[in-house]
Structures are given as structure tokens and as C-alpha cells.
Amino acid sequence: MTIQMSYSLAAALVSALLAPLALQAGTPQSIEVVSFGAPRERLLQLGACPGCDLRGQSLQGEHLIGVDLRDADLRGVDLREANLEGADLSGARLDRADLRGARLSNADLTDTDLRRADLRDAVVINAYAPNVRTDGMRFAGADLTGSHLIYGGGPD
């Protein structure tokens, strides 16, 4: 038996074993798209909901570490005691949001609207916050260490 013949025999054997596993050409394949429904559900399932409208929702005590909420509408959202460490909140609207006791360390707050938000007792260490809007923000007892958060709100 020659080497050429042995190679051909081995190739034929491998081909015969794998043939049942091959897809037939032209067989349509479908991909099922699963919707996560409401924006709140999408945020909790995927950890991202950029541009979502979450106005008035309750996310109290949720673990939202590193979530993507860029340009989200979070006006009036209850985020008391929520963990938003490392979250991307750039461009988000958080006016009148309740962030009492929330953890926002290392969050991106670029261009975020925090007007009239309640950040009392929140931890906002080393958050990146250029162009943040803070008129009327409440921050008594908040730890703003290293955040360069230029606030305009009063102490209560």
C-alpha cells in the first residue's frame, strides 16, 4: 500500500464519519431574538440601558455596578442605597432623583443633570464629573472625596 493510497483511505474515513454532522447547503437557519421587555427589566438583565426612559422607577438597593446608563432619563428615580460604582451615567438626567445613601464611586457623571437630586449620605468618591449640573442638589453627609463635583446645592 502506498503513502498516497493510505492518505486517501484516511481522508475518506474521516469524511464518512463527519458527513452526518455537516449542515446541508441552502438550509435556512433562524436566530430567535429575545426581548427583555421594559427598560427596567433590560437594565437589570443586561446591565445596560443607554438612552432608556426610567422616569419614576424604583431601583432602590439594586446592585448596578458598572452599568451603562448613558443619556438615560432617570428623573425622579428612587436609587436609595443603590450601588452604582463605576457606572456610566454620562449625559443622564437625574434631576429630582433620590440617591440617598447610594454608592457612585468611580462613576462617570460627565454632563449629568443632578439638579434638585438628593445625594445625602451618598458615597461619590473619585467620580468623573465635568459639566455636571447641580443647582439645588442636596448633599449633607455625602462623601464627595476626589470627585471634583462642583455643587451648587445647599447643605440640607
Model feature map: region roles:
Residues A10-P20:
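Bacterial N-terminal signal peptides
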Residues T2-A12:
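Bacterial N-terminal signal peptides that target proteins for export
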Residues G26-D156:
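Tandem repeat scaffolds
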